[in-house]
């Protein structure tokens, strides 16, 4: 059964590479999600999350300032944010990193490069479990 996804949910896309943010944004738009905002690293993203009633976070791992894994840990440690689903899209395919992300509470993990179908499948899986 496919999860019923709220197409109006507010999504924050966090990646230091603007092209990657645009790719993710376009794929989300193709899936019907138009309510997206962008941040270029965890240091920029965290204050946005604290005051922005976001419903979902898509983040890269390797970024200057604050890495995606640290952003995830900060989200999970914050009473207001800890419920937020987080999807990590990264080139980091090492088993240790996938385990570290899982232990930190990531909801989904996609290794680049990826397709729209992979993104949709992960979103469906994440929202089935919420």
Swiss-Prot record:
Q: Which organism is it from?
A: Vibrio cholerae serotype O1 (strain ATCC 39541 / Classical Ogawa 395 / O395)
Q: Which cofactor does it need?
A: Mg(2+)
Q: Where in the cell is it found?
A: Cytoplasm
Q: Which GO terms describe its cellular component?
A: cytoplasm
Kindly state which keywords UniProt assigns to this record, in alphabetical order: Chemotaxis, Cytoplasm, Flagellar rotation, Magnesium, Metal-binding, Phosphoprotein, Two-component regulatory system
Report whether Chloroplast shows up as a keyword of the record: no
Stated role: Acts as a response regulator to control chemotaxis. Involved in the transmission of sensory signals from the chemoreceptors to the flagellar motors. Switches the flagellar rotation by binding to the flagellar motor switch protein FliM. In its active (phosphorylated or acetylated) form, exhibits enhanced binding to a switch component, FliM, at the flagellar motor which induces a change from counterclockwise to clockwise flagellar rotation.
- Give the matching Pfam families: Response_reg
Q: Which GO terms describe its molecular function?
A: metal ion binding
For this entry, the protein name equals Chemotaxis protein CheY-3
What does changing residue 16 to K do? More frequent reorientation during swimming behavior
What subunit structure does UniProt give? Interacts with FliM.
Summarize what gene deletion causes: Defective in chemotaxis and reorientation in liquid medium.
């Amino acid at each position: 059964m496919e999860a019923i996804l709220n197409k109006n949910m507010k999504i924050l896309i966090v990646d230091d590479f603007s092209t990657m943010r645009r790719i993710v944004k376009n794929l989300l738009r193709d899936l019907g999600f138009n309510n997206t905002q962008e941040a270029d690293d965890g240091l920029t993203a965290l204050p946005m999350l604290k005051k922005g009633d976001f419903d979902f976070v898509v983040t890269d791992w390797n970024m200057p300032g604050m890495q995606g894994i640290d952003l995830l840990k900060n989200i999970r440690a914050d009473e207001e944010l800890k419920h937020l689903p987080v999807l990590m899209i990264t080139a980091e395919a090492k088993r240790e990193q996938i385990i570290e992300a899982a232990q930190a509470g990531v909801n989904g993990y996609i290794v680049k490069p990826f397709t729209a179908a992979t993104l949709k499948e992960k979103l469906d899986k994440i929202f089935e479990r919420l």
